[in-house]
C-alpha cells in the first residue's frame, strides 16, 4: 500500500515552493503519493490574527534570507519574486476547477513562473501563458473561477 502525504500549498508561498522541490527529490522513486491541497495563505494569516511577513520589514528580510539558505542548501533553483506578495485567489481557484489530468502541470508551471522565473502570475497576460503552456481552455478557466475576462 502506497503511503500518501497531504501537501498544503499556496503558489505565493516561497516555503510551499521550496518544500515541494524537496519532496520531489525525496520522492523520485515514487515511494509515496503527494495529495495536493490548495489553501489561501493570506486567509490563514487573517484567521490566526498574524501579520504576514510580507507586511513586516524585519520578517520579510528574515524570510528572504531563510529562503535563500534553504534553496542553496538543497540546491533548489529559486529567485525571489519582485511582485511578492500577489493575490493568488484566482490561480488557487483555477487549480480546483481544472481537469484532474492537467493539475500537476498547472501546479508545476505556476510555481516555476513565480519562484524560478520571477514572473507576475497575477497578471492576466501571464495567466494566459500558463494556460496555453498547460493546454487549458482559457474561456472555461476564467468562467469557472468567476473572473469572466
What are these regions (language model features)?
Residues 2-6, 15-32, 100-105, 109-149:
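C-terminal cap of thioredoxin/glutaredoxin-like
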Residues 10:
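Residues immediately within or flanking Cys/His clusters that coordinate Zn2+
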Residues 17-117:
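Structural alpha/beta surface segment adjacent to cysteine/selenocysteine redox centers
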